[in-house]
Amino acid sequence: MKAFVSQALQGALQQLHAQGRIPGIPATLELDRPKQVEHGHLASNVALLLAKAVGRKPRDIADDIVAALPASDWIARTEIAGPGFINFFLQPAAFHAVIHRVRTEKEHFGANRNGAGQRLQMEFVSANPTGPLHVGHGRGAAYGASLANILRFNGFDIFCEYYVNDAGRQMDILAASVYLRYLEADKALPWPFPENGYRGDYVREIAAHLREQVGDRLRHAAVGLPNLPQMSDGDIAIDTLIAHLKQSLGEDYRTLHSAGLDEILADIRDDLEGFGVHYERWYSEGSLMDTGAVDSAVAALEKAGHCYTQEGALWFRATAFDDDKDRVLRRDNGAYTYFASDVAYHAEKFARGFTHVIDMWGADHHGYVPRVKAALRALGLDDQQLEVVLVQFAILYRGTEKISMSTRAGEFVTLRELREEVGNDAARFFYVLRRADQHLDFDLELAKKHSEENPVFYIQYAHARVYSLLRQSVEKGLSLPPADGVGLEILQESREIALADALWRFPEVVATAARDREPHQIAFYLRELAAAFHTYYNSTRILVEETPLRHARLTLCLAVAQSIANGLRLLGVSAPEQM
């Protein structure tokens, strides 16, 4: 309907321009929805935009525009308000047309082709495979998967990717932690487990599986084991242990390293699949090393004159590209930094021909954005094609009690535990109830409630109520409406028009949610649509004896159910027909 009114407004402006009464037509015509229906269904400020160029009062220009509007079966009347706003009041027929459209387009209602021809790469979650996913990772997973669905619904070609940090120091710390638990099982660990090792029970499980696989084959590395408690610096202590294990185990260090990586990565994959989060590719950081991509990226920066050596380390001159300080690419021991791998990874993303790249990182990585963009500019790439969405933390509550967590200590609620307690639907929905850059309080007790307080239950219940009406119709021997040909002109009540008006908004919300990268707009819309439906359901007798009226009202209800199902699908939430 907005497109129809915009077209009519465009026609009026073209007529005035042809008559020489306005010098030109604005490039974009904004049509807003007034907050109060008394001010119309749509409003335009075009007369105010033209006032300066025309040299006349906006209200007088608005009078000319209204007079030039073509006759329409959908526009009931117009009203000039305030300094020169044009308010449009629509006929019921316009809203009936929306109901027909929903019933015709079905699961495609709300989709558009705004992103046609654009190929986007999205990277999200990408948690280090050093332990199970926890509830904090769940927010990034739900946000990323929902945004991918929304962008696809807007016609974008989306490629989702998980970057596996399998080549860094944290993986070595995990390997060392597994080895210490491997020794501990035989009481062969001479001192307490170090504080900066990975301490979760899952490490013991990995160590037990490793023992089943290799037996005592790795025990020999316990000889000459450095005495970690005697070292005052925990980082130096753990690095000394890692160096000892690499030297003592030789090729078997790869077996130890893989024991943790393979088991945890398999668990992460399974967890995300179970959460409805799917990737086109799992991209290994180690593959960047193996293929020489990191060497090539660093060499390109050196060749362009953007690097220098200081105290044996190779530095990238990031300050020349608006970062707050220069960054190390290669340490004095010859090892590349995580930043060097990240530069290579992003250069490789652009080499694959994506028109746009979206990274979703934890909010604690905000300082990382300038350095990555600086490296892209230094490589001659357009850093504006990289968009970084920072996802704030999710804080877990059980009622009013906050649940504290420590990842390294192994004291955390896993994503799998959350899903098992509240269900996938509640988890997916609650995670996207706020903008990504806002802190999220996740109340476990609320997520399990079967009441109006729980938004996902409230929305799903609206969908189920529609199908309950259909079952009741069959039980009462009442005919159901045909797929098409239902006369909707009989729907004239204000609540029916309001409900159809809410349906009309869905395609707009889909478009703005994609533009703003905000899945929560879909969640908010669905809650409003469900509220409008529940109000209608509770105040209106839908299964009346009169067949034409019953068919029309059921058709309206089915259109509501379809819109709810479409919106929930974008958020990865089911739309049950019975609850």
Curated annotation (Swiss-Prot):
One of its GO terms (molecular function) is arginine-tRNA ligase activity. Keywords: Aminoacyl-tRNA synthetase, ATP-binding, Cytoplasm, Ligase, Nucleotide-binding, Protein biosynthesis. It holds the Pfam family tRNA-synt_1d. A motif ('HIGH' region) lies at residues 127-137. The keyword Aminoacyl-tRNA synthetase applies. Its EC number is 6.1.1.19. It catalyses: tRNA(Arg) + L-arginine + ATP = L-arginyl-tRNA(Arg) + AMP + diphosphate. GO terms for biological process: arginyl-tRNA aminoacylation. Its main location: cytoplasm. GO terms for cellular component: cytoplasm. It is found in: Cytoplasm. It is an enzyme of class 6 (ligase). It comes from the Bacteria. The keyword Cytoplasm applies. Belongs to the class-I aminoacyl-tRNA synthetase family. Monomer. HAMAP family: Arg_tRNA_synth (MF_00123). This is Arginine--tRNA ligase. The gene is argS.
